[in-house]
């Protein structure tokens, strides 16, 4: 949960708007494509950690501290993904559309 007050949020939003307003549409589109690819990569990696955590949870030979470490890693990854998703959303808002980004073959 975000602990910032409404004036801090407004200041942050104005700063983001100003940052993207100086960029051309082609620059914004390139940034959006890069952010979309990064988002997909994070989702793929997060899913791999989650699946490992689930497998470890079902294995009685895995110690509690190891399970806790996997859970902590997953939660930390979720927080990073949330921040990246917010940034992507801001970029797409500034751009005005979602560019078509084909999936990479390696994911």
From Swiss-Prot:
One Pfam family per UniProt: Prok-TraM
Superkingdom: Bacteria
GO BP annotation list: negative regulation of DNA-templated transcription
Keyword Transcription (UniProt): yes
Region (Disordered): 1-20
Keyword terms, alphabetized: Plasmid, Repressor, Transcription, Transcription regulation
SS bond list: none
Function in brief: Acts to antagonize TraR-dependent activation.
Recorded family membership: To A.tumefaciens Ti plasmid TraM.
Protein name: Probable transcriptional repressor TraM
Organism: Sinorhizobium fredii (strain NBRC 101917 / NGR234)
